[in-house]
A protein has these predicted regions:
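Conserved ABC transporter NBD signature motif
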Residues: 19-40, 46-54
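Hydrophobic anchor residue at the start of the ABC signature
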Residues: 127-128, 155
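Conserved ABC ATPase "signature" region
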Residues: 76, 90-109
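Conserved beta-strand-loop-alpha-helix hinge in the C-terminal portion
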Residues: 184-216
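Catalytic Walker B motif of ABC-type/P-loop ATPase nucleotide-binding domains
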Residues: 138-142
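Conserved ABC ATPase signature
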Residues: 113-117, 121
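Helix-to-loop junction immediately C-terminal to a conserved catalytic motif
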Residues: 11
Length: 217
């Protein structure tokens, strides 16, 4: 198991060669949870995407900061699946984007190109894109990379607020910070070791991983 492949499997971009990934779904018309898996056919994938929406914040260094797009456009792009390819975003979409921009503390930067943003501002814009569709799950890949410690504290405050409305999977090399912020831990290094709480001792880490590890919380 490698981090990138695992994330793609969770997001439904890859199908696991063995085993399955289950998504717990509760609909408004049926309070009894159902489980969908991503080893499904294309039509079942469509059902999964419609019933279990996911948001994704990619790793910072995968973003092309020269791409000519504004903060507002980045956040609106999180609603692209709610319109056709040729139609425009509606007034409702733009109002939702305005609310997310305010929540991310980006008022006044709506028309600014992403290349002119600080690292923290760009991360907030990308986080806004990930949550604007009200997903059931948000996957965050190294969200604190390239941001200063002051904004890192604010980032985790935002994530705690968002976690009231949806599940979060956070990928990080920063073991110390992750252990303080999350409810459970999965250590990934070819194999995956899951811990239902954050009780991962330094001795356990040294015994089982004699190289840098990645944590999913």
């Amino acid at each position: 198991v490698y981090k990138r492949q695992l994330i793609k499997c969770i997001l439904g971009l890859l199908k696991p060669t063995t085993g399955e990934i289950l998504y717990r779904v509760t609909t408004a018309s049926n309070n009894n949870p159902a489980f969908l898996d991503n080893s499904a056919t294309n039509s079942q994938f469509s059902t999964l995407n419609s019933q279990f929406s996911m948001g994704y914040l990619p790793q910072y260094n995968s973003i092309d900061r020269k791409f000519p797009i504004t903060v507002e456009e980045v956040i609106l792009s999180g609603l692209s699946s709610q319109k056709s390819l040729i139609s425009r975003f509606t007034a409702t979409h733009r109002e939702k984007a305005r609310q997310v921009i305010a929540r991310m503390g980006l008022e006044g930067l709506e028309k600014r190109a992403i290349g002119a943003l600080s690292g923290g501002q760009l991360q907030r814009a990308l986080l806004g894109r990930a949550i604007i569709s009200d997903p059931a799950l948000v996957v965050l890949d190294e969200p604190s990379t390239y941001i200063d410690k002051r904004f890192e504290a604010r980032l985790y405050e935002l994530l705690a607020e968002i976690n009231h409305d949806c599940a979060i999977i956070l990928v990080s090399h920063d073991i110390g910070t992750v252990l303080q912020q999350v409810k459970s831990i999965a250590c990934v290094n070819e194999t995956l070791d899951y811990h239902p709480d954050t009780g991962v001792s330094e001795e356990w880490l040294e015994r089982n991983f004699n190289c840098p590890i990645e944590l999913l919380g």
